[in-house]
């Protein structure tokens, strides 16, 4: 069992409060480990069945997402938009492996939403990992807005700067140059600019 899934299992198991929940979770894990078409169908039903606990939906979505089953997409995006950063990180890892073309658009929408800026870190990191056409515009837009805002949210701004550096796209140089004027971002922005300047131009 991969480390990410083991961490998810440990986290969920620690949150269970009754023998019935423990038994239900063991049954769910048995489906995950079965790795058969019939088991995948059962996991997909968990995603849409009424009154399923959040931990069941999360586990089923992660298991399906990491094997490329696109039925997990909506649940994983919901988890990516969740207030719990650990749950967001788990969803991002599954989405990175899902291979659904909708993922980058959804992550960009979350990353650029000014109302959700506190929770933008994992959508930003996911966009960097995906290296999708939406990645650079979304990170640049978010960084531009944060630099102009009264509250800069330095951790999110730094993630944008570092992400743009990792993507190495010359289109990001103007906003990175603005970011370099802020002491909290100077070192990361200068490094990102250097990478963007040496990137091959299409």
Question: What residue spans do the PLM features occupy?
Answer:
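Structural detector for internal amphipathic alpha-helices that build alpha-solenoid repeat scaffolds
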Residues: 1-2, 14, 18-36, 45, ...
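Alpha-solenoid HEAT/Armadillo-like helical repeat scaffolds in large eukaryotic proteins
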Residues: 11-15, 42-50, 75-83, 106-114, ...
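Residue-level hotspots at or immediately adjacent to binding/recognition sites across diverse folds
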Residues: 103
């Amino acid at each position: 069992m991969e480390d990410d899934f083991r961490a998810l299992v440990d986290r969920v198991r620690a949150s269970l409060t009754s023998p019935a929940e423990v038994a239900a979770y063991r049954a769910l894990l048995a489906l995950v480990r079965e790795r058969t078409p019939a088991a995948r169908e059962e996991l997909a039903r968990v995603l849409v069945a009424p009154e399923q606990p959040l931990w069941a939906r999360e586990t089923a979505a992660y298991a399906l997402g990491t094997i490329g089953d696109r039925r997990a997409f909506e649940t994983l995006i919901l988890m990516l938009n969740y207030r719990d950063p650990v749950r967001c990180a788990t969803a991002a890892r599954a989405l990175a492996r899902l291979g659904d073309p909708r993922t980058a658009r959804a992550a960009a929408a979350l990353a650029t939403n000014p109302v959700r800026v506190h929770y933008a870190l994992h959508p930003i990191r996911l966009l960097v990992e995906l290296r999708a056409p939406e990645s650079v515009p979304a990170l640049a837009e978010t960084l531009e807005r944060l630099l102009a805002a009264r509250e800069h949210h330095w951790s999110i701004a730094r993630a944008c700067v570092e992400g743009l550096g990792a993507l190495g796209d010359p289109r990001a140089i103007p906003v990175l140059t603005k970011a370099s004027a802020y002491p909290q971002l100077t070192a990361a922005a200068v490094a990102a600019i250097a990478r963007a300047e040496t990137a091959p131009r299409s």
